[in-house]
Design a protein with these regions (language model features):
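Short beta-strands within extracellular/lumenal beta-sheet-rich domains
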Residues: 120-137, 186-189
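Recognizes extended acidic, P/S/T-rich segments that occur
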Residues: 14-43, 57-62, 174-182
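Extracellular glycan-recognition surfaces and repeat-rich motifs
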Residues: 21, 78-123, 253-255
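Extracellular carbohydrate recognition
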Residues: 123-126, 207-224
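Pro/Thr/Ser/Gly-rich low-complexity, intrinsically disordered linker/stalk tracts
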Residues: 1-9, 44, 59-78, 225-253
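Extracellular carbohydrate recognition and processing domains
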Residues: 166-196
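Extracellular low-complexity, O-glycosylation-prone stalks/linkers
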Residues: 7-29, 161, 252-256
């Protein structure tokens, strides 16, 4: 809702609005007889500029503005969806940070990662994703990369899920616990098929004390592939002209 105060005794106004930075005269214009207006049909997570002008009949005042505002975030609806945490991404507006009271909390670092730095008191800090609806084969799997700055002072995190809101108490589902990434980016993949049909938020929850720095990057929401990749490839019985290989099936396949 947009509100303003009359300049004098006028009873009519012109209002114009458009996406941030638009050229006046090219926006949406509305003639009004009240000092408030509810704008509808806007895009989520978008900045808009608004101008208002008094219409005194035979004369008009200069335009007042711009007044800028940013609309709220909606659900993620396009998949696959990737967040690389690059500084300046408007999508970062849709991630929430909850600081449990310690000196440092989750930030979006200048090198394009989400990061949390050590604190002399225990973290109880949440990095919370935007909402999305989990659909089979479309948005039922997440992947992301994580790393620690130090192996000796390694931070850890829990990955939690909420099917209600974004308050810490809402994150009652545990996807992974006590995850300690190495000092080089490691990819993590989690199956969320158990939550098909539900709206969810994910949270990276840090609880460590006085360690170093943890980084999260390339958070992606995607569908579980019809044919999953094998994992755990290892070699054994290494001889001069032969080696035995073994791996774990991705699902129920019987050929490789």
């Amino acid at each position: 809702d947009i509100n303003w105060t009359a300049g004098a005794t006028e009873s009519a106004w012109n209002l114009e609005y458009g996406a941030s930075g638009y050229t006046q005269g090219t926006g949406t214009s509305i003639a009004l007889t009240a000092t408030n207006y509810s704008i509808t049909g806007l895009l989520s997570n978008t900045t808009y500029d608004v101008y208002v002008q008094a219409d005194c009949g035979s004369d008009q005042s200069p335009w007042s503005g711009p007044h800028s505002f940013n609309t709220a975030c909606g659900s993620i609806t396009t998949f696959p969806h990737n967040e690389d945490f690059t500084s300046g991404n408007t999508s970062l507006n849709c991630w929430e940070v909850v600081n449990g009271g310690d000196a440092n909390t989750w930030v979006f670092s200048t090198n394009g990662e989400a990061a949390i730095q050590y604190s002399s008191t225990a973290h109880d800090d949440y990095l919370i994703s935007p909402k999305w609806n989990i659909q089979a084969g479309t948005s039922d799997r997440i992947t992301f990369e994580a790393r620690n700055e130090s192996g000796s002072w390694a931070e850890q995190f829990d990955l939690l899920l909420s099917t209600s809101g974004t308050s810490p108490a809402d994150f009652t589902e545990t996807i992974a616990t006590n995850v300690v990434p190495p000092t080089t980016n490691q990819s993590y993949t989690y199956d969320l098929a158990a939550y098909i049909g539900q709206d969810v938020h994910l949270a990276f929850h840090s609880t460590t004390t006085d360690l170093l720095v943890l980084y999260i990057d390339n958070f992606e929401i995607e569908g579980i592939p019809a044919c999953l990749a094998p994992s755990g490839l290892v070699s054994s019985n290494l001889l001069p002209t032969s080696a035995d290989l073994s791996w774990t099936a991705g699902a129920t396949e019987s050929a490789w």
